[in-house]
Amino acid sequence: MAELKPFLAKVANREVLTRDEARQAFDILMSGEATPSQIGAFLMALRVRGETVDEIVGAVTAMRAKMLPVEAPADAIDIVGTGGDGFGTYNISTLAAFIVAGAGVPVAKHGNRAQSSKAGTADTQSVLGIKLDIGPEVIARCIREAGIGFMFAQLHHSSMRHVGPSRVELGTRTIFNLLGPLANPAGARRQLLGVFAPQWVVPLAEVLKDLNAESVWVVHGNGLDEITTTGTTSVAALEDGKIRTFELTPADFGLAHADLADLKGGDGIANAAALRAVLSGEKNAYRDISLANAAASLVIAGKAETLHDGMKLAAQSLDSGATAAALEKLIAVSNDEE
């Protein structure tokens, strides 16, 4: 049985693990071969010292090796946030994902129940009528037939059960808050990834570059793990193997500045109702911010040349009923397991 102790000793000594050492250490963690106190100590030592790009790459590699994979088209995109920004907004990436699917780009969305808000994407999708507890074949069919499939993280990363109790007991952020969005079970190489703190924007773009991602924007928007309409969004874009950084404002999307209070969500029931209201034509701050995130996703996917074009396509998807049709089709296919 492999031992975590040598790796624990290194990080306790503020030494950095190589990529391979991190892979080995996380393999031990996710194989149930470390004690709860070792897991807690290891995760906090990393957190206090600060996780490096190589350590995150090694950890993601271990996590991907253990996940339950899903088949998806090569051009599928994931629109996902780390969660943990503490603001409890509506499920912005969820609505953006349906808009993108309605615009004709396959979406392989990975997500979980709420971490710090009252409703994560899984909570809201469950209320909408989407069946979460489905196998990889059904999810692949959802992506093929509805243009969007939802992968419920805990079903695809069962090895996480070995670290779950320690994470709950620690009650604070660990490296695992970053890993989930980097371990998409469908292997999506295109991604809009929102992070909970600005210092992670560039490092996570570097991680995804090292993991051979194709086209990615890592974003943090004025406190949110989304592109925001409440202020400035920091972006690290990975395109053609190169990372460039820039900032976006609501004006770049042709949108007015919004107040955070107008984006405050509730529980799964409230958030599902808000999402359906936008699908029914309600024009509000939730619609605007979701359109902005969808527009960026359409640029990442190569479907739109510019954010202006992306906004036009996204609005067409919503206003034509294509977004609502993608949702209804996903509900139907996810509940039909024949």
UniProtKB/Swiss-Prot annotation:
Gene3D superfamilies per the UniProt record, alphabetical: Nucleoside phosphorylase/phosphoribosyltransferase catalytic domain (3.40.1030.10), Transferase, Pyrimidine Nucleoside Phosphorylase, Chain C (1.20.970.10)
Protein residues bound to Mg(2+) 1: S93, E226
Coiled coil, from the record: none
Residues that coordinate or bind 5-phospho-alpha-D-ribose 1-diphosphate: 81, 84-85, 89, 91-94, 109-117, 121
Enzyme class, broadest EC rank: transferase
Positions with a binding annotation for anthranilate 1: G81, N112
Xref: Pfam families: Glycos_trans_3N (PF02885), Glycos_transf_3 (PF00591)
Statement: the UniProt record of this protein carries the keyword DNA-binding: no
Residues reported to bind Mg(2+) 2: D225, E226
Binding note for cofactor: Binds 2 magnesium ions per monomer.
Highest taxon listed in the record's lineage: Bacteria
GO biological process terms held by the UniProt record: L-tryptophan biosynthetic process
Keywords on record: Amino-acid biosynthesis, Aromatic amino acid biosynthesis, Glycosyltransferase, Magnesium, Metal-binding, Transferase, Tryptophan biosynthesis
Catalytic activity: N-(5-phospho-beta-D-ribosyl)anthranilate + diphosphate = 5-phospho-alpha-D-ribose 1-diphosphate + anthranilate
Residues holding anthranilate 2: R167
GO cellular component, as recorded: cytosol
Cofactor needs: Mg(2+)
Pathway, per record: Amino-acid biosynthesis; L-tryptophan biosynthesis; L-tryptophan from chorismate: step 2/5
Role according to the record: Catalyzes the transfer of the phosphoribosyl group of 5-phosphorylribose-1-pyrophosphate (PRPP) to anthranilate to yield N-(5'-phosphoribosyl)-anthranilate (PRA).
Subunit structure of this chain's protein: Homodimer.
Annotated HAMAP family: TrpD
Protein name in the entry: Anthranilate phosphoribosyltransferase
Gene name tied to this protein: trpD
